């Protein structure tokens, strides 16, 4: 089963487990770098929780996800269509003030991540910002019928080098540690500006 198949099959359960997750600190840190009413690409929108938050704060949001069932959940929640796209199929150009990739790029294989980062770089306006989070670690692993490509401060560096300038990088506790927890039970969070 691929990670996308997992989300398609378990979308309702995933919704219940994540819709009320407290990510206010992440929002606050990210939005410090996003202009008011700016345009945000919610890359890997999942159940739509984050898209709804940004829309309610006055931002223009384009949600995308590789899981058709997640796209349906997001579309129903926010009252507008989310796009059914894999990260590898994102081809926007100079359109976004920011990209929010919360707990989503962690399913992109290491050998494809640089290409996705290049697409994100192209999608952002000059000086646009990227937020991304990964399970904390340094290796690929299988958990709960999904594949995870964990990152730490050193392993993320070559994927953003020459594309993004790190503004903030921090480790945070995994508040849902029973859900495919990393061995370290932590997340790597990155906010970086397009170079």
Feature names for model-found ranges:
Residues 47-89:
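Class I SAM-dependent methyltransferase SAM/SAH-binding core
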Residues 114-126:
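A short glycine-rich, Lys/Arg-flanked "PGG" loop and its adjoining helix->strand segment in the class I
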Residues 127-134:
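Conserved beta-strand signature within the Rossmann-like core of class I S-adenosyl-L-methionine
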Residues 1-35, 37-46:
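Conserved class I S-adenosyl-L-methionine
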Residues 88-99:
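A short acidic, Gly/Pro-enriched loop at the edge of an enzyme's catalytic core
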Residues 139-155, 179-180:
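Acceptor-substrate binding/catalytic loop of class I
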Residues 165-176:
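Conserved S-adenosyl-L-methionine
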């Amino acid at each position: 089963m691929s990670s996308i198949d997992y989300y398609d099959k378990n979308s309702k359960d995933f919704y219940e487990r994540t819709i009320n997750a407290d990510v206010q600190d992440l929002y606050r840190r990210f939005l410090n770098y996003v202009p008011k009413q700016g345009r945000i690409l919610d890359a890997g929108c999942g159940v739509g929780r984050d898209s709804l938050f940004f829309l309610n704060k006055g931002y223009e949001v384009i949600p995308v996800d590789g899981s058709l069932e997640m796209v349906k959940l997001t579309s129903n929640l926010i009252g507008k269509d989310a796009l059914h796209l894999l990260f590898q199929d994102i081809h926007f150009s100079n359109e976004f003030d920011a990209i929010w990739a919360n707990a989503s790029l962690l399913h992109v294989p290491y050998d494809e991540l640089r290409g996705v980062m290049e697409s994100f770089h192209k999608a952002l306006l000059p000086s646009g910002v990227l937020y991304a989070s990964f399970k904390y670690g340094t290796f690929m692993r299988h958990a709960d019928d999904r594949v995870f490509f964990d990152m730490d401060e050193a392993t993320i560096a070559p994927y953003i080098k020459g594309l993004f300038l790190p503004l903030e990088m921090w480790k945070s506790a995994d508040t849902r540690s029973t859900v495919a927890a990393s061995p370290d039970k932590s997340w790597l969070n990155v906010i970086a500006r397009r170079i």
